[in-house]
């Protein structure tokens, strides 16, 4: 048996068949592929699926992970969630939908799984049992949820949601609802190939195991982004071990200053007082990826020594 056939068998063993129980639409999943003349084509590679986001269960007995599959004709991909034993045995697919599921984590001591899904039309936070049953939506944020982080005691959830940043011509002149022009009077109106119309903000909500309440934008009214574009994600946030505060990364600058400087900071938001403190004030570099020591006494982060482009990371 040649190496290519062995690889194909390994890919086949990776997942089980997607068997939806009801009408779910076209599910992009694992497709049969024919290897001709032993050539590793694009189609063969895509048929393997891409494994990502492995998370070990709290009792260290299982692994939760996702597998993404592509459809060339539709120019789309789809990601499903799987669970297997820590030794690689008993693989089970626990989602089977046309919408991708991602950012999955164990909660409730491993009894449940929280994840993002676009099943309701946009990306929202969902919860299901560890075996994939009883899936239910718990967030209904207007502009969708783009990442989330449970507090250590699981009584609060931080999630990322977009807020409006700039006005369009149609906002200023409602009777011109088909207008596509833009009113630009300052930097930074475009980031690479993206018009800056919305920016991400961190929200904190209380969680009782069933629903989100007391949702608060902890940067409400601030014209700054967190996480920072274009690469920032949920790693830009960290809860303190006692669940009483959360650290976040932001570059609180606008206009020309935002365009010329990479000086970002780590901020600490206290849930009880709703006050924010700059933990890296005076540090002029690109401060990112906060974390805390187990006792919560020492915050750490990546940083740069200067406020301009550099590839050297320090801790």
Functional labels for PLM-detected ranges:
Residues 30-49, 215-221:
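A short helix->beta-strand "capping" segment at the edge of beta-propeller domains
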Residues 48-63, 98-116, 135, 142-157, ...:
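Conserved beta-propeller blade repeats
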Residues 303-313:
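Conserved small/polar residues in nucleotide/adenosyl-binding loops
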């Amino acid at each position: 048996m040649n190496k290519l056939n062995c690889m194909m068998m390994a890919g086949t063993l990776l997942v089980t068949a997607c068997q939806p129980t009801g009408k779910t639409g076209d599910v992009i999943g694992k497709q049969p592929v024919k290897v001709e003349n032993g050539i590793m084509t694009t189609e063969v590679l895509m048929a393997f699926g891409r494994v990502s986001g492995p998370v070990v269960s709290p009792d260290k007995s299982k692994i939760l992970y996702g597998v993404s599959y592509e459809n060339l004709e539709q120019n789309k991909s789809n990601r499903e969630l799987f669970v297997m034993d820590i030794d690689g045995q008993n693989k089970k697919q626990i989602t089977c939908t046309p919408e991708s599921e991602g950012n999955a984590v164990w909660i409730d001591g491993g009894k449940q799984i929280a994840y993002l899904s676009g099943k309701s039309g946009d990306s929202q936070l969902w919860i299901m049992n560890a075996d994939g049953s009883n899936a239910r939506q718990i967030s209904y944020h207007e502009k969708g949820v783009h990442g989330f982080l449970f507090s250590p005691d699981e009584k609060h959830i931080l999630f990322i949601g977009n807020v409006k940043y700039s006005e369009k011509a149609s906002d200023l002149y409602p009777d011109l609802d088909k207008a596509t022009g833009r009113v630009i009077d300052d930097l930074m109106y475009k980031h690479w190939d993206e018009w800056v119309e919305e920016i991400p903000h961190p929200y904190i909500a209380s969680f009782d195991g069933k629903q989100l309440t007391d949702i608060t934008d902890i940067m409400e009214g601030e014209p700054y982004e967190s996480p920072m574009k274009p690469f920032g994600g949920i790693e830009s946030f960290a809860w303190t071990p006692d669940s009483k505060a959360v650290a976040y990364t932001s570059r609180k600058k606008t206009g020309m200053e935002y365009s010329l400087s990479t000086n970002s900071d780590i901020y600490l938001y206290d849930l009880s007082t709703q006050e924010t403190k700059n933990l890296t004030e005076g540090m002029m570099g690109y401060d990112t990826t906060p974390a805390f020591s187990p006792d919560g006494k020492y915050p750490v982060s990546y940083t740069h020594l200067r406020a301009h482009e550099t590839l050297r990371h320090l801790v």
